[in-house]
Amino acid sequence: MGEIKSIKCSEVTQNELKFGIYHTSDFFPFMQKLSIPHRHNYFMILFNEKNYGSQLVDFKECAIDPMSVTCMHYGQIHQWIDFANIEGYIIVFEN
């Protein structure tokens, strides 16, 4: 396995605020780029309202269920697997 790239919060937010709230439909283009393992240098909260999906967190598959909340912390390794149908909001932020 190759080196796992770290993703900065500013790469996600596309600004220096180090904070962003996105509807999942607006976040899909960025999620597609992150369909390989990557390390977070920020925190992420996913509020999924509808449909099902999946992701890897520290190389373990985690389901994304309707009406669920997923929290990712700084340093975790993450990979989007099945995200095309989820609907909700993503919050990203640094300390």
What are these regions (language model features)?
Residues 59-73:
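Short acidic-glycine-tyrosine-enriched beta hairpin
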Residues 1-56, 60-63:
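Generic protein-terminus/edge-of-domain signal
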Residues 49-53, 73-75, 84:
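Short, solvent-exposed loop/edge-beta patches enriched in aromatic
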Residues 75-95:
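Ligand-binding loop in jelly-roll beta-barrel domains
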Residues 39, 71, 92:
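Short aromatic/basic micro-patch
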